[in-house]
């Protein structure tokens, strides 16, 4: 994926309306943002808990109401690019940009001191997406932890968005999946590197046990054959999986 800077420029389209035409406001779009981090020599559970608490205090003091939640993702398989990913959920691009401007001007220096030796963020690997929910969970997961898997997929020759929609419809009609499972597709708000995915798929489960159970149900349907026929996903059929902890709600 193409590297982007932390602060993205927001463009506003202003249209002229006649006095007889009512003004219409665009509906804010929810966003999700991923920031790669590497662990430092002083990284441990106690220090991570400390920096999470400090970060939440800073966000509270900023009155950053546009942030609707935050998570930390830890990869199931070691990755050279990151040791953990800090995830932020936003209710709009405008609100996100306001919070980042405030953070950069008033909080970043203190944050850098707080995390020194514990972890460091990578401003060359900050990725913003627009999520679209494909299926909501049957029940809200309030445990504070979950697992998820990302798939970066392209359409095979002769297939396209209509086939993805058809696949989603069939998947959503399968009975027996765990109550906390849900999924979204993610639209990158940056220019991905080649090969560019046609869509990014993200599955979320309440636990590893739920994931294993759901994958067993999935394997007994005709859907795996559809996936192989219609889509090619990277890095492979297993995707990229994480343990996740909610750090702000």
Residue ranges and their predicted role:
Residues 4-14:
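Sec-dependent N-terminal signal peptides
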Residues 17-249:
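Short S/T/G/P-rich N-terminal loop/turn motif that feeds into the first structured element of a domain
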């Amino acid at each position: 994926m193409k590297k982007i800077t932390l602060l993205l420029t927001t463009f506003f389209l202003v249209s002229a309306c006649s006095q007889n035409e009512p003004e219409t406001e665009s509906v804010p779009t929810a966003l999700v943002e991923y920031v790669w981090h590497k662990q430092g020599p002083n990284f441990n559970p106690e220090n991570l808990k400390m920096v999470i608490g400090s970060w939440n205090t800073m966000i509270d003091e900023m009155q950053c109401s546009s942030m609707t939640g935050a998570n930390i993702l830890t990869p199931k398989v070691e990755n050279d690019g990151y040791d953990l990913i800090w995830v932020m959920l936003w209710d709009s691009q405008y609100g996100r940009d306001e919070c980042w401007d405030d953070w950069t001007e008033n909080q970043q220096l203190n944050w850098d001191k707080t995390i020194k030796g514990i972890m460091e963020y990578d401003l060359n690997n900050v990725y913003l997406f627009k999520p679209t929910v494909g299926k909501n969970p049957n029940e809200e997961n309030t445990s504070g932890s979950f697992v998820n898997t990302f798939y970066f997929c392209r359409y095979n020759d002769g297939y396209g968005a209509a086939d993805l929609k058809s696949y989603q419809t069939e998947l959503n009609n399968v009975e027996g999946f765990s109550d906390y499972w849900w999924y979204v597709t993610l639209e990158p708000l940056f220019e991905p590197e080649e090969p560019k995915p046609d869509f990014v798929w993200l599955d979320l489960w309440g636990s590893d046990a739920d994931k294993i159970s759901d994958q067993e149900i999935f394997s007994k349907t005709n859907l795996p054959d559809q996936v192989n026929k219609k889509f090619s996903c990277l890095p492979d059929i297993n995707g990229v999986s994480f343990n996740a902890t909610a750090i702000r709600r």
